[in-house]
């Protein structure tokens, strides 16, 4: 019973709604339509309200039923009735009615309205339909039913969505628009100006395309018009077009995270690539490195909200650095907020830091434009106040020139790495010049060696501009044709002048004519016969030349006249350059040194040249220009100064013997950071203490040799384990076994670096096994052990070799001894004054074998040995 009353009430309300729109429908057809709705939609509400959303769901079910069962299962008037009821529930757009109202206001061309005409607001939708019983019934005649069918057929043709297809409706609208334009032109010709209004009737939007049958029936909504285009500058339009064409526009940082378009802001996240590069820069170079600060300055030009700055700092900084940045950022924001409060700017402290009611990112998009500049300034200032990072920077020793890499490309990589680490440009250039020579390949080093001290980076690049693979091939062919090594050919190339003639100044040794050493250290110098002077004719005291006689009296004590001729060459005229008591340009002694104060215990020592120390360089020797010997009866202790230790310079202590006549040098290192030592800077001190002689003394003088350990031997007892030794070969470490039976060292192929060049050797390698044409290194390799022994060799490379073998080409340079001494004989010989590798003898005459002792037969007793 209640169901019947609900249906009658629903039919009655539908009739009232349709009559309100001027359409008369019989109740019989409405009852049949409602029955079909209940059949298709069993869930259709029998009680409660029917709104637009529920009615659209009914339309979806009708469309599904139409698709599955075909048009014969759907009554003809169903789609029309559903469309009529949908429009009764939704009055959102009635364009023709608004246009008609606007046209009525413009009927009198001579009448100027006082105010801008406004559109009539759309009528409110009818109230929701309530389901309650009602006994009222309304019946239609046959004439009314026929009129209803005609009106229903015309109704959906007047729908707004079909203006593009209905010629009559389109013509009516065009006539109205054309009439409106004619009236406007007539008013302008009459001299009457219409008031400007941005809400004047806009130009008609483009009509949508032809609709599908479901859209024409009203089951599907018509497709909307395209959204209005965003306003962009000409440069942004060009970048957007280039991006669509596939061009890379990542270098143009013009897209801020906060944008404005048609007075509406929107947000875009930061590019992941930009955050990744900033994270790598903070990890490798530190947060305060010049390269990292430059990236932060570039990031600060964007309109970043506070949450973006905090997320960027949290992602790129360590935990401690992030807390320091955050506290400094809050402090900077507090200062800015105080200034804003005094000047009446509506940007509070909570807005700047993004806390409180402004914690969400959406609320941070509505700040004043100047607030983003203040936030970026505070974030950048807080970033710059972070402490210098103590993390390990990129190892400069790894920036090495490849065998085929152009020298200018290598210098460019080196300068780029140093520029990212060091902010001091002068110190960076000094370090770059030093590494540009040390990390270059062998060919460039040979070309740069004569100009290492007097050239700069520009000279280095110009000298090595033509050195490449073809140059190395030519050097190798020249060495093969001349029967010389590559080093000798390179030296020969350096010794030629611009005209191709051999230079006279650097042609080699003046004694033997061979390159590679000077005449003072020539091994053949001592083999030449030199006339020994007889008794001096001037003083008659000794055997020396008269020109070298310095005696003031003769053998009888009579005074002698001064020696005629030119005396020794003196210092050049001009002002003297003093470096803490040390006269530059002359050979200084201990007597030339000065103390800092009257009560200073040590004599100050300083470096003579500008030097840069890095942690990768290890211990370096610094020249002081001061030579021995020390005062008689004293010995020197070389110690560091407290001021140098505070700067990070580590001075390694040492002992200077009393009879040492060479140059006193300072052993210094910078284990923690890069240190710059200027010329004349006091970094060490020499403490003189009394010499106490105790124990046995070897009868020889140290002279100018032996700076460092001179009598230290590497001793390794032969055990069941293999005698292994680690060598550093061209900055790489290799461990191998000592092999006294191998003429040339051999490196296993699995340990050989792939970037090192090698060639096929025209020889046969024999040992326990045999191999033909083995591979050999194409260039000379420099090796060095932990004791400072160094040399060059060209090892063989063999596959399937389990270990590396160090042969006699390395062991001979190390000075390795193989002997099996008897403890009793060794102790006896040492007591008699035996010196290793020199033998017995008072004058070190080299008697290695024991003397053949023969007793004196002329005397009796204990005996006398000659």
Curated annotation (Swiss-Prot):
Top-tier EC class: hydrolase
EC number: 3.6.1.23, 3.4.23.-
Ranges of compositional bias, category Pro residues: 119-128
Domain notes: Gag polyprotein: Late-budding domains (L domains) are short sequence motifs essential for viral particle release. They can occur individually or in close proximity within structural proteins. They interacts with sorting cellular proteins of the multivesicular body (MVB) pathway. Most of these proteins are class E vacuolar protein sorting factors belonging to ESCRT-I, ESCRT-II or ESCRT-III complexes. Gag-p12 contains two L domains: a PTAP/PSAP motif which interacts with the UEV domain of TSG101, and a PPXY motif which binds to the WW domains of the ubiquitin ligase NEDD4.
Designated name of the protein: Gag-Pro polyprotein
Catalytic activity annotation: dUTP + H2O = dUMP + diphosphate + H(+)
Region of interest: Disordered: 103-148, 550-570
Organism whose genome encodes this protein: Sheep pulmonary adenomatosis virus (Jaagsiekte sheep retrovirus)
Domain G-patch: 821-866
Annotated site residue numbers, Cleavage: 99-100, 256-257, 477-478, 713-714, 831-832
ZnF endpoints (CCHC-type): 507-524
One biological process term in Gene Ontology: proteolysis
Motif segment (PTAP/PSAP motif): 202-205, 287-290
Family indicated by similarity: In the C-terminal section; belongs to the dUTPase family.
Motif stretch (PPXY motif): 208-211
């Amino acid at each position: 019973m209640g169901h019947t009353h609900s249906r009658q009430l629903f039919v009655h309300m539908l009739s009232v709604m349709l009559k309100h729109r001027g359409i008369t429908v019989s109740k019989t057809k409405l009852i049949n339509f409602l029955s079909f709705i209940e059949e298709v939609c069993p869930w259709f509400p029998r009680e409660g309200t029917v709104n637009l959303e529920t009615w659209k769901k009914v339309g979806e079910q009708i469309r599904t039923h139409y698709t599955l069962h075909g048009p014969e299962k759907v009554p003809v008037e169903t789609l029309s009735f559903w469309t009529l009821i949908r429009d009764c529930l939704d009055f959102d757009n009635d364009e023709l009615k608004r246009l008609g109202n606007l046209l009525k206001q413009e009927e009198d061309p001579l009448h100027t309205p006082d105010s801008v005409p406004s559109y009539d607001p759309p009528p409110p939708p009818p109230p929701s339909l309530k389901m309650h019983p009602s006994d009222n019934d309304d019946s239609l005649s046959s004439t009314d039913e026929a009129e209803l069918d005609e009106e229903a057929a015309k109704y959906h043709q007047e729908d707004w969505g079909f203006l593009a297809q209905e010629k009559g409706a389109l013509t009516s609208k065009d006539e109205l628009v054309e009439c409106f334009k004619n009236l406007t032109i007539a008013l302008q010709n009459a001299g009457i100006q219409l008031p400007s209004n941005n809400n004047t009737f806009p130009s008609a939007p483009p009509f949508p395309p032809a609709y599908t049958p479901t859209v024409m029936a009203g089951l599907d909504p018509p497709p909307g018009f395209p959204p209005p285009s965003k306003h962009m500058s000409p440069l942004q339009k060009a970048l957007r077009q280039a991006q669509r064409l596939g061009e890379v526009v990542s270098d143009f940082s013009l897209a801020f995270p906060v944008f404005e378009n048609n007075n509406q802001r929107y947000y875009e996240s930061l590019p992941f690539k930009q955050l990744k590069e900033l994270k790598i820069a903070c990890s490798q170079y530190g947060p305060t490195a010049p390269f990292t600060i430059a990236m932060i300055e570039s990031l600060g030009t964007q309109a970043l909200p506070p949450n973006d700055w905090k997320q960027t700092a949290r992602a790129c900084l360590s935990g401690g650095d992030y807390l320091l940045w955050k506290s400094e950022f809050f402090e900077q924001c507090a200062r800015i907020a105080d200034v804003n409060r005094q000047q009446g700017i509506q940007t509070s402290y909570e807005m700047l830091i993004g806390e409180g009611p402004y914690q969400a990112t959406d609320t941070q998009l509505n700040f004043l434009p100047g607030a983003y500049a203040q936030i970026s300034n505070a974030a950048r200032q807080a970033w710059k106040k972070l402490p210098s990072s103590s993390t390990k920077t990129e190892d400069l020793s790894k920036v090495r020139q490849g065998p085929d890499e152009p020298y200018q490309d290598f210098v460019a990589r080196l300068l780029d790495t140093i520029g990212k680490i060091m902010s001091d440009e002068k110190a960076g250039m000094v370090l770059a010049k030093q590494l540009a020579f040390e990390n270059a390949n062998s060919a460039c080093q040979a070309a740069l060696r004569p100009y290492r001290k007097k050239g700069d980076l520009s000279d280095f690049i110009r000298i090595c501009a033509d050195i490449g693979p073809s140059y190395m091939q030519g050097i190798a062919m020249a060495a093969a044709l001349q029967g010389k090594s590559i080093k000798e050919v390179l030296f020969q190339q350096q010794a030629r002048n611009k005209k191709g003639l051999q230079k006279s100044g650097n042609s080699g040794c003046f004694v033997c004519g061979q390159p590679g050493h000077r005449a003072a250290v020539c091994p053949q110098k001592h083999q030449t016969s030199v006339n020994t002077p007889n008794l001096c004719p001037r003083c008659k005291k000794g055997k020396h030349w008269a020109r070298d006689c310095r005696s003031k009296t003769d053998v009888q004590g009579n005074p002698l006249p001064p020696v005629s001729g030119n005396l020794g060459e003196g210092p050049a005229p001009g002002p003297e350059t003093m470096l803490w008591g040390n006269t530059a340009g002359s050979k200084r002694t201990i007597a030339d040194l000065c103390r800092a104060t009257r009560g200073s215990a040590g004599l100050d020592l300083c470096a003579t040249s500008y030097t840069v120390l890095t942690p990768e360089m290890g211990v370096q020797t610094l020249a002081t220009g001061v030579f021995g010997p020390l005062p008689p009866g004293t010995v020197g202790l070389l110690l560091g100064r407290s001021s140098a230790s505070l700067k990070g310079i580590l001075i390694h202590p040492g002992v200077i013997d009393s009879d040492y006549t060479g140059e006193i040098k300072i052993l210094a290192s910078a284990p923690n950071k890069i240190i710059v030592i200027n010329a004349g800077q006091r970094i060490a001190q020499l403490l003189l203490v009394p010499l106490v002689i105790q124990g046995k003394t070897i009868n020889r003088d140290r002279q100018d040799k032996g700076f460092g350990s001179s009598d230290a031997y590497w001793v390794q007892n032969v055990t069941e384990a293999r005698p292994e030794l680690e060598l550093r070969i061209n900055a790489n470490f290799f461990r191998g076994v000592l092999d006294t039976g191998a003429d040339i060292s051999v490196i296993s192929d699995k340990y050989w670096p792939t970037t090192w060049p090698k060639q096929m050797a025209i020889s046969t390698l024999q040992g326990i096994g045999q191999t033909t044409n083995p591979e050999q290194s194409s260039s000379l390799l420099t090796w060095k052990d932990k004791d400072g022994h160094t040399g060059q060799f060209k090892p063989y490379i063999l596959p399937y070799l389990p270990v590396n073998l160090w042969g006699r080409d390395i062991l001979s340079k190390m000075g390795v001894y193989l002997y099996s001494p008897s403890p009793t004989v060794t102790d006896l010989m040492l007591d008699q004054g035996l010196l290793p590798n020199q033998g017995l003898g008072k004058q070190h005459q080299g008697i290695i074998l024991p003397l053949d002792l023969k007793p004196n037969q002329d005397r009796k007793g204990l005996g006398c040995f000659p």
